A protein has these predicted regions:
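Canonical tetratricopeptide repeat
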Residues: 31, 65, 99, 133, ...
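Structural marker of alpha-solenoid helical repeat scaffolds
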Residues: 55, 89, 123, 157-158, ...
Length: 663
């Protein structure tokens, strides 16, 4: 059914022209967009609302709905922009103020969020929801008393919402009023006995008060309400560990990892429990996982070094202590432990040097006892083998960035555009369907091959068919004078069967016959680039844009051998001179510039491509990646938002990752 509706929409989008505004049914598109959103099909909702807004720029409800769809896809910057447009079109749009405030709150822009809430409340002081959402924002902004006041106002009108009591209880907890916090958690439970969060919150308070029996009962109830509620398994595991039941603790940590296999904090805690029962090898495996997901956390290496030493891996232990020291040079304990291990390795001078540094750090610590962060790492009596609570990474814990994303999380540029052979299908390159170049259309007509298309997608012609087609072109070239059109097609088939050197030669022969044709240079360029990528893959040395947990890292190349795209770029320079208004030339050149590490030049070329084709989704996507690498994350995410709006679903995956990191 959904595919059928999408097909109807696409057909309508193609038939509606600038002069056929009367055919456009505003209410229909609005209704279909809402229907997609009710089904949580937010990407189709955005595509539908794009059609609505293309023909009715004043449809403020359309911007509002599209903003909600983007919000649900974690495209917060795009959502904020759409809510802003809705407000500009309708300055008394109360709900748009509320939703923009919520979006700005999630972006950490609390001041502007509070201003929006004030506008919404001034417009409609009788509506309770704005008070609740402002209370949450004030809670996040650590304005706890003001947040309590907002939750009070909300509860006066809506006294059956358990989350309001829950959040008010959290505010009291931060104000050290555990009595009021406990009372609010109890009211939340009475209001909704099926909400696992209420039991979990009360259990956390009881756990901090070492009332383990009551805490365990609350975590049991939370799990009974929702068997997939991760937090309560995690907290109950800590209760089991605190009450000397390590096997039950491990079972709960195992369950957490079944629900979230990338949860670094759980691996860390499970490693501690495993080491406590002498299961050092499996503890080491867990610490390896933590190091993989959170490569910049000092405690991972410190604790893993201790396990390595227990297992007799002295050199590995020294490496881990060295890494801990590299991350935190004032870590006196790490110096002391490395000193002992270096002594065992007969490195007496290194051992003595570490011991002297440690003693100096300890002396400095004694003069700076008021600096708690410093003292933790310089205090030789401090233990680092205690389990960490789930909010440790957001509550100023020494564990820091335990929940950071994988260090090996790689995101590649979208590929180059080139002329290739594809059998017709229902899918098309996102941009290709919206951009028309008469010169390119005339070129394809001249070639007269119904399978020829300009795309960034791979050919879908079977390999054996490509080989047969290439042999046919070879016979034709031998039987008659070689035309540039036939040479061009032979170059394509040679590229597709990975005869790159021959393909470059064939394209060169075509260029010799028609040196003023920009499309011949375009394809020779992409073939040269593909040849470089193919060679680099054989060397196991991919050179590509990657995004890592450390945003300071740049283009990666795992081998010392490097490859350059100079000849491919030179072809694109020639193509740009011959046809300066063709956006795909600049897009391809930008890709090669990025792969060569020339990020500012890549940014400029993507921008030129977008100027020539404002609906160039792939260019927005790749420019977004480049800007993220240039540490302009906000602008990069704005480009990702536009790419997603224009139809690239991968953009929302990146936005989700960066939204998660900023929370």
């Amino acid at each position: 059914m959904r595919k059928g509706i999408t097909g109807v929409l696409l057909a309508l989008a193609l038939t509606i022209g600038a002069g056929s505004r009367a055919q456009y049914d505003r209410d229909y598109f609005y209704y279909v967009g809402r229907s997609f959103m009710i089904d949580n099909n937010f990407e189709d909702a955005i595509r539908t609302l794009n059609i609505l807004l293309r023909f009715d720029d004043d449809a403020y409800e359309g911007y509002f709905l599209r903003g909600i769809a983007k919000y649900n896809l974690d495209d917060l910057l795009g959502a904020e922009a759409d809510f802003t447009t809705a407000i500009e079109k309708n300055p008394v749009f109360t709900t748009a103020f509320t939703y923009r405030a919520i979006t700005r709150s999630r972006l950490g822009n609390y001041d502007d969020a509070l201003s929006d809430f004030a506008e919404a409340i001034e417009l409609r002081p009788d509506l309770p929801n704005a008070y609740y959402s402002r209370g949450v924002t004030r809670l996040l902004n650590q304005q706890f008393r003001e947040a309590i006041d907002d939750f009070d106002k909300f509860i006066r009108q809506e006294n059956k919402v358990s989350d309001a009591y829950l959040n008010r209880g959290v505010c009291y907890l931060y104000l050290k009023d555990t009595t009021q916090a406990y009372a609010n958690f109890e009211t939340a439970i009475r209001t909704n006995r099926e909400n696992p969060m209420s039991y979990n919150r009360r259990g956390e308070l009881e756990m901090k008060q070492q009332r383990y029996k009551e805490a365990e009962a609350d975590f049991d109830m939370a799990i009974r309400c929702d068997s997939n509620y991760l937090l309560s398994y995690f907290n109950r595991a800590i209760v089991y560990s605190s009450t000397n039941r390590p096997m039950q603790s491990l079972a709960d940590f195992d369950r957490v990892l079944q629900l979230d296999s990338t949860n670094s904090l759980t691996y860390f805690n499970r490693a501690i429990v495993r080491s406590q029962i002498g299961d050092y090898n499996r503890a080491l495996e867990d610490y390896d996982k933590v190091a993989f997901y959170s490569p910049e956390n000092v405690l991972v290496y410190y604790n893993r070094a201790g396990i390595q030493a227990q297992l007799g891996n002295i050199e590995s232990a020294v490496e881990d202590y060295s890494k801990a020291i590299e991350l935190y040079p004032d870590f006196a304990n790490a110096y002391l432990n490395r000193s002992r291990l270096r002594y065992l390795l007969k490195d007496e001078s290194g051992s003595r040097r570490d011991r002297d540094i440690a003693q100096r750090k300890i002396a400095e610590y004694k003069t700076r006892l008021s600096d708690s962060t410093y003292s933790i790492y310089a205090d030789t009596t401090h233990r680092f083998d205690r389990l960490l609570s789930f909010d440790a990474n957001v509550a100023g814990s020494t564990f820091g960035r335990i929940a950071s994303k994988s260090a090996d999380n790689r995101l590649a540029l979208l590929p180059l555009f080139r002329f290739t052979l594809r059998t017709p299908d229902s899918l098309s390159t996102v941009t290709a369907g919206r951009y028309h170049s008469q010169r390119e259309a005339d070129f394809r007509r001249r070639i007269d091959n119904r399978y020829l298309t300009l795309t960034a997608r791979e050919s879908n012609v079977p390999a054996d068919s490509l080989v047969m087609l290439d042999k046919r072109y070879a016979r034709e070239l031998m039987a008659e004078p070689a035309s540039w059109e036939l040479l061009f097609q032979r170059g394509i088939t040679q590229t597709l069967i990975k005869q790159y050197t021959n393909a470059v030669g064939t394209f060169t022969s075509a260029i010799d016959q028609y040196p003023a044709n920009p499309f011949l240079y375009l394809n020779r360029s992409t073939t040269r680039a593909e040849m470089i990528d193919f060679i680099s893959s054989i060397d196991n040395s991919y050179q590509r844009i990657t995004i890592e947990s450390d945003p300071a890292k740049r283009l990666q190349n795992s081998q010392s051998r490097t490859y350059n795209y100079d000849e491919a770029i030179a072809d694109l320079n020639k193509a740009a001179k011959l046809y300066p208004d063709f956006p795909y030339t600049y897009y391809n050149r930008a890709n090669l510039m990025a792969l060569s590490g020339k990020l500012p030049e890549a940014y400029n070329d993507y921008t030129k491509a977008i100027e020539l084709n404002p609906a160039f989704a792939e260019a927005y996507y790749n420019r977004g990646l480049v800007q993220i690498f240039m540490k302009d994350t906000r602008k990069g995410c704005l480009d990702m938002s536009k790419a997603g709006e224009l139809g690239i679903p991968e953009a929302y995956e990146i936005l989700k990752q960066y939204t998660a990191l900023d929370r």
